[in-house]
Every structure is written in structure tokens, then in C-alpha cells.
Design a protein with these regions (language model features):
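Intrinsically disordered, low-complexity proline/glycine-rich segments
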Residues: 2-175
Length: 175
């Protein structure tokens, strides 16, 4: 019942994982554009700050108090489009795998297990896996709010990394 009450504030419909759920705006990637990520209760919990006037696309993920928790940055001069993520001591590189019809992204995590994002990335219907186990799901179907999509994370310890990966994947998919 508590999950239903929490989810109701952001227009949340059915979802599958037991962890925290967040709402993100759909078309978020104008450089210099900032937006808030809200939790299931509608609280502003993270801010994505699109840095303008940079040579490469950069987004800063901040907590509700304005503290930087992650930097997501386009990696220039590589064969394939890539974005790097720095979240505290965690460093990761997100890049698109060119196989098949469906979108697949690989997230190489330094010193940790790599992640995979696959599904319909452009329509915000995909999941993120670690070692074959789903750690997050991204879906528009849960929300009644127009131009928004939900991100549900299985383990609260993965929230910052998953949200940063979601920002990077979205930026690469809509580049």
C-alpha cells in the first residue's frame, strides 16, 4: 500500500522491481538545459545540469542540495560515440553496440561488473542488467505524465550510477 501511495504522486502505474522509482523528462538534452529527477512521491531528488559552452556534451548530476554526485561527459575523438561517467570513485564508459535491430549499450565499469542496457532505447522501454540480472527498468508505460518516463532501480546502492547511465544512454540515442 505504501508503494501505491508513493507512486500515485507521479502518476505511476504498474511496475515490477521493488526498489526506488524516479521520474525523468523525455526530451532533456538541450545543452544548457537543466531538469529535476523526482522520486515516486514527487520530491525533487536529483538535478541534471546540462553544461553550456563546453567543447563536448557534459551533464552534471547533482543531489537536491546542489552537490555534484556524477559527471556524464561525451568522449570525443573515438571511433564510436561514447560517454564517460564519474560518480565518486566509480568510473564507467557507455557505448552503443552495433548489433541487430534492437538497441544495445555496454557500460564498462572500472573495477566492477559491466552493465548492459537493451530494449527500445528511443521509446524509453529498456532494462539495465549486471551479470544477466536486471538491476533497473526504464519505461514510459508506468507514467500518466506526458513527456516523462520512469526509472526503477532494484538496489538503492545503484541509484546514482543507474540514473547517470540513463542520462548517458538517452544523450547517445538522441544525438
Amino acid at each position: 500500500m505504501l508503494a501505491e501511495a508513493k507512486g500515485h504522486a507521479m502518476g505511476l502505474r504498474n511496475h515490477r522491481l521493488d526498489g526506488p522509482t524516479f521520474q525523468m523528462r523525455e526530451k532533456i538534452f538541450a545543452i544548457g538545459d537543466d531538469f529535476w529527477i523526482e522520486d515516486a512521491a514527487g520530491n525533487k531528488v536529483f538535478k541534471v545540469n546540462g553544461k553550456a559552452l563546453r567543447a563536448r556534451e557534459t551533464f552534471i548530476l547533482e543531489d537536491a542540495h546542489g552537490n555534484e554526485v556524477s559527471k556524464i561527459q561525451e568522449k570525443k575523438l573515438s571511433v564510436r560515440d561514447k560517454m564517460t561517467i564519474e560518480s565518486g570513485s566509480t568510473k564507467a564508459t557507455v557505448h552503443k553496440r552495433l548489433i541487430g535491430i534492437r538497441d544495445h549499450y555496454t557500460i564498462e565499469v572500472e573495477g566492477g561488473e559491466d552493465l548492459k542496457a537493451h530494449g527500445n532505447i528511443v521509446d524509453h522501454e529498456y532494462e539495465i542488467e549486471r551479470d544477466g540480472h536486471q538491476i533497473a527498468e526504464v519505461s514510459k508505460k508506468w507514467l500518466r505524465v506526458r513527456d516523462s518516463y520512469g526509472v526503477e532501480v532494484n538496489d538503492p546502492a545503484d541509484v546514482v550510477l543507474v540514473l547517470a547511465v540513463t542520462v548517458a544512454v538517452d544523450a547517445l540515442a538522441h544525438d
